Amino acid sequence: CEGMSFEEVVDFAAENHLECLEVACWPQGGASRRYAGVSHIDVAGLTQEKAKYINEYCKKRDVEISSLAYYPNTLEPDLEKRMAYIAHLYKLIDASAMLDVNMITTFIGRDPHKTVTENLEIVKEVWPPILKYAEEKGVKIAIENCPMLFTEDEWPGGQNLMTSPANWRKVFEILDSPNLGINYD
């Protein structure tokens, strides 16, 4: 749905008898990797008025928003980038609550230059405040489980820690929250 407006995406879903969709909500301005930068809802500029319009548009077409989607590497080794990614994730949580979607889909992330054990330590620092905020807003977070392999130098770990049942269990032990789950697709 890259290049399509929010309305075009919803209309496509309705015309093809789809009941719900995950709506891309990347920051405005694009990004360098495939699919990054696609944004059908500008969560940074979302107002109550715009949220009402979005909900009414979907309702008229009998299409539900299942989640708001943003897939950055929240364990990015560059701290400036990491903080920008996390700041947008908070906006996604706010928008999900405002739209009464109450679900976001994202990645846990991974520093591809560190071991699983080292990445789990970063998870302990980065994710508890995000989850606490989501819990306070009544928003669930579903983590996608693909490895995010884009270039040869990311093998074997990729940019997402949530790639195997063993890693899932370790992350869920650290982040014991009823608001955290897996987006299995």
Language-model features, listed with the residues they occupy:
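Short, N-terminal intrinsically disordered low-complexity segments that are rich in Pro/Gly
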Residues: 2-3, 44
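Loop/helix-junction capping segments adjacent to catalytic residues or to phosphate/diphosphate-binding pockets
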Residues: 3-4, 113
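Acidic/histidine-rich catalytic cores of soluble enzymes
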Residues: 4-10, 14, 68, 118-185
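Structural motif corresponding to the early beta-alpha repeats
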Residues: 19-129, 135-140
